[in-house]
Amino acid sequence: ESQAELSRGCPDSDLDGVTDPLDAFPSDPFQWADSDGDGFGDNTNVPSGDDCVDVFGKSFEEGRHGCPDADLDGYADVDDLFPEDQEQWADFDGDGWGDNYFWENTTVADDDNLGMFITLREQRGDAFPEIASQWSDIDGDGWGDNQSSSNRVDNFPLRVSQWNDFDADGFGDNAVAGAYQPDACPKVPGTSTANDEFGCPD
């Protein structure tokens, strides 16, 4: 029952002292007003209170409620490093690529082998959120495509089964079954290709 001066004796479902017709939150005893009409109460003394009482907003992440959130990802613009990208909000390594990594596989023609195809990734976000010098991994092997980096460099960015090339002869060091053109002489540079023996002196 409401105890407010002009509505004493009227229904007050949450018993906060504000009658239901005047209570913006009739079932919440800790909230009753919503100045900006964004659905977050003006009482900031509770965790769910509106942190931007006079400004409409829908943020709810990182403990900041009811503040402007242009991309509607839940993160207030002031906390969002990508305020216009709904998929991204953080960038741990500061390389300009968001930490949320998504990809879709796509099949393309293999330019090095006529009539063959390879599977590559169409990427969004940072494939290496903790390595500032790497962000892309188009073949999905866990090694980065940025050749100028000194960290986890993929010497074969289009070959999922190869990444290292110790002798720098263009043939990969991974010799497991099914690997692409494995180097039969991984510590000695070579150009051999006959009989599937790649990378030996010729």
What are these regions (language model features)?
Residues E1-D202:
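Extracellular calcium-associated, cysteine-rich motifs in secreted modular proteins
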